[in-house]
């Protein structure tokens, strides 16, 4: 039986990655810095995952796990990594830099011949490469090249707002996709982990961009239009014909990029879009627009779900008007209770000039063909609050 270390004991960690590592026969060690969460995991011998679909619900029991607090027990985490088979994480792209030092120490402490598999399960393009970059700053190059295999992945599974008093149990969408590149393992001449839930591919880029620019773009577009319209859930928002039309227009534009760039057929992409719309329309998920819309600063950043596809479309001379509309709605997601980034967004738009705000939020160069169009939308939103 192997051992997996997973950074991030939240709903994605327990309800997606943890589930599939458990089913693959691994003992899972959850690592987090939230004291109450770690204590709860340590004191709870099992938890349930309820998969939700329009056909009903199915419950699974998860066991054979432990938990460690990397803040107070870093040395223990280092020793666990030193003897682990796989390290995964679901902590958010901006937290990767903070987990890198302990992973670096764990690699330095390894004396097993098989390299450690490292997979960052984040909603970001090539997040494992990002994590590797942070680890490289903390240890010698030969430690990384000899003792680890880093593989990027694309993940897709909706984890809605959880009911109160749900404990460690997780309600989660039945549908899932976990695609991981196998090339790094081939290059090292080692076998990839035997996790049946993972779809191993040679070329990951099409999967990452298709997922990010369809699922995440469509989901967030629905949330931002829905928020402005006073809708409570994603399903409610998509029942509004005007919002549904706007979402389809956005996904038509991202589809044109995916088809043009990756050679995916128009019919295949259309079926993928239809499946995504059906999934996020599922009323049984009870997925709140504020949950999906949270962290607007990250979602408006350069390589994310709006500026990412819009910038590439602009560079190719293709249409991006609907994406501009979604960007404008995202700019209006301000001062939402419980979301610090929405408050910071309001502050930036209030205190900075339109040019300063556009550059800070999007990281676009001023001579980029998208820049002036986003600048115009920033000005529009700023003028509304004057």
UniProtKB/Swiss-Prot annotation:
This is Mannitol-1-phosphate 5-dehydrogenase. GO terms for molecular function: mannitol-1-phosphate 5-dehydrogenase activity. Its EC number is 1.1.1.17. Monomer. The gene is mpdA. GO terms for cellular component: cytosol; extracellular region. InterPro entries: 6-PGluconate_DH-like_C_sf, 6PGD_dom2, Mannitol_1_phos_5_DH, Mannitol_DH, Mannitol_DH_C, Mannitol_DH_N, NAD(P)-bd_dom_sf. Keywords: NAD, Oxidoreductase. GO terms for biological process: mannitol catabolic process.
